[in-house]
From Swiss-Prot:
This protein's name: Crassicorin-II
Source organism: Urticina crassicornis
Subcellular location as annotated: Secreted; Nematocyst
Role according to the record: Peptide with both antimicrobial and neurotoxin activities. Cationic AMP with antimicrobial activity against both Gram-positive bacteria (B.subtilis) and Gram-negative bacteria (E.coli and S.enterica). Shows no significant antimicrobial activity against bacteria S.aureus and P.aeruginosa, as well as the fungus C.albicans. In vivo, induces reversible paralytic activity towards the shrimp P.paucidens. May act by impairing sodium or potassium channels in the prey.
A GO biological-process term: defense response to bacterium
Gene3D superfamilies to which the protein is assigned, alphabetical: Anthopleurin-A
Family assignment from sequence similarity: Belongs to the sea anemone type 3 (BDS) potassium channel toxin family.
Gene Ontology terms: cellular component: extracellular region; nematocyst
Disulphide bridges, residue numbers: C6-C30
Top-rank lineage group of the source organism: Eukaryota
GO molecular function: ion channel inhibitor activity; toxin activity
InterPro entries from the UniProt entry: BDS_K_chnl_tox (IPR012414), Myo_ane_neurotoxin_sf (IPR023355)
Tissue: Highly expressed by the mesenteries. Moderately expressed by the pharynx. Weakly expressed by the gonad and pedal disk. No expression in tentacle.
Keywords: Antibiotic, Antimicrobial, Cleavage on pair of basic residues, Disulfide bond, Immunity, Innate immunity, Ion channel impairing toxin, Nematocyst, Neurotoxin, Secreted, Toxin
């Protein structure tokens, strides 16, 4: 299963903005895509 957490947007494998702080470039990091 996917393990998604919100982190500052830095990479390629980052998806979505749901449940992430707004206005700070946060995205979901899904480890399952690495």
């Amino acid at each position: 299963g996917a393990s998604c957490d919100c982190h500052p947007f830095k990479g390629t494998y980052w998806f979505g903005t749901s449940n992430c702080p707004s206005g700070h470039g946060y995205r979901k990091k899904c480890d399952s895509f690495f």
